[in-house]
Amino acid sequence: MTDLIVFDKDGVILDLEATWLPVARAVAHYTASRIPDDWDGNIGGVDLLAAIGVDEAAGQIDSRGIFAAGSFADIRSCWQKMLPSHMIKLDQDHRYQQDVQILVDRHGRNQTVPKGEVEAPLRQLHKDGYQLAILTNDSESSAKRNMQDIGVLDLFCTVVGADSGFGSKPGPHGFLHCCQGAGATPAASIMVGDTMADYGAAIAAKAGDFICVADSIDDRPHQDIHHENVIDRIDHLPALMARRSLC
């Protein structure tokens, strides 16, 4: 029996590229602009984007890449290794972090795009008695703002971000906190996600199951994910849960 459904946010409830591609572009090109003029390397914004799984020319984000599956801390760590040794430390420079936050607010605010029809299935699941939670590698405040933008924040008993104090996925602690908040055991809780980080969190937390959101079975992040657990949009989730309850 399932009591709690824990959702990843981007690529599951939200259209990852439509919502976040403008932010990724802005932050990468700003970061490249901070490279000292005396460096003889050849790294630009396009290279920084490619390193985190973003193809700027094609306008595509790889669901297996760092941008889709990691946190902003993971992105900064990846970029720092590519940048000159005498450049600012991205995770320590306050001006850089403030400027990035301004860019995120400017390019991300009011740009929340759902991945198809999401409100109706989420409300149906809530009506069916499931508790719902969000577990994202984005920040908690950003996740709450996104859910408010699409009118579904009221449905979630818990929203956990990478900065909420429980670590980031694929660690288990965010998932376990969602379970604690809902009064549900991990075995009675499932994770709905699209990346290896989501699947890894479910495995680490000993979740009851994992539902994958992917365009096709071949796009699932791990071959151990059962074919019948792959859906292309969450509007298929209420019917899937109904079938599972009959088993």
Name each model feature, range by range:
Residues 109-115, 136:
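Conserved beta-strand/loop elements of the cytosolic catalytic core of P-type E1-E2 ATPases, chiefly
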Residues 12, 136-138:
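Conserved phosphate-coupling serine/threonine residues in phosphotransfer and NTP-handling enzymes
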Residues 64-67, 110, 166-167, 229:
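Pocket-edge positions in alpha/beta enzyme catalytic cores
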Residues 1-5, 18, 33, 119, ...:
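Asp-based, Mg2+/Mn2+-dependent phosphohydrolase catalytic module
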Residues 20-31, 53, 75-79, 97-104, ...:
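Hydrophobic alpha-helical core bundles mediating ligand binding, dimerization, or RNAP-core interactions
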Residues 47-103, 116-119, 123-124:
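A metal-dependent, Asp-based hydrolase signature
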Residues 1-56:
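Active-site neighborhood of HAD-like aspartate-dependent phosphohydrolases
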